[in-house]
């Protein structure tokens, strides 16, 4: 049984401490205090994807307004990566969020490191398979 749950501050703290340092490079990880402040102000929405009562994946969004969310962090727990959990979670989130525009950002595959470029291309392909469209905006 799989469910999507909106997360509270306590759950955000737990995920941050248990999973996020492994899943994201230090330079990309916001301080927990910043996320909590945004959540208190209603500008940060956090969701967990649970399978059989255990966390399988999580997604954190910055809320621009009632119709637009920026996907800030998205990850599957290490033991479940590569098993379709991320795709299932995105589909379930789409149903829960009901027509909200979700924006995501990915790094372009323009590094001098071939391995890094391969990972970036896999990430882009994953989001495209999930229904995201690649824009021509480069920042």
Please place each PLM-identified region on the residue numbering.
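A short, internal acetyl-CoA/4′-phosphopantetheine-binding micro-motif in the GNAT/acyltransferase core
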Residues: 74-81, 108-109
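Conserved acetyl-CoA-binding loop-helix of GNAT-fold acetyltransferases
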Residues: 82-96
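Conserved acetyl-CoA-binding loop of GNAT-fold acetyltransferases
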Residues: 123, 128-134
């Amino acid at each position: 049984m799989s469910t999507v749950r909106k997360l509270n501050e306590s759950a955000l703290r737990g995920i941050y401490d248990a999973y996020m340092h492994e899943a994201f490079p230090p330079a990309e990880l916001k301080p927990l205090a910043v996320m909590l402040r945004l959540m208190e102000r209603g500008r940060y929405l956090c969701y967990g994807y649970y399978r059989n009562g255990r966390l399988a994946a999580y997604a954190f969004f910055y809320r621009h307004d009632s119709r637009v969310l920026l996907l800030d962090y998205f990850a599957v727990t290490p033991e479940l990566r590569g098993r379709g959990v991320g795709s299932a979670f995105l589909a379930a989130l789409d149903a829960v969020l009901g027509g909200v525009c979700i924006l995501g950002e990915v790094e372009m595959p323009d590094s001098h490191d071939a391995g890094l470029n391969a990972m970036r291309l896999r990430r882009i392909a994953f989001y495209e398979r999930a229904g995201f469209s690649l824009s021509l905006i480069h920042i």
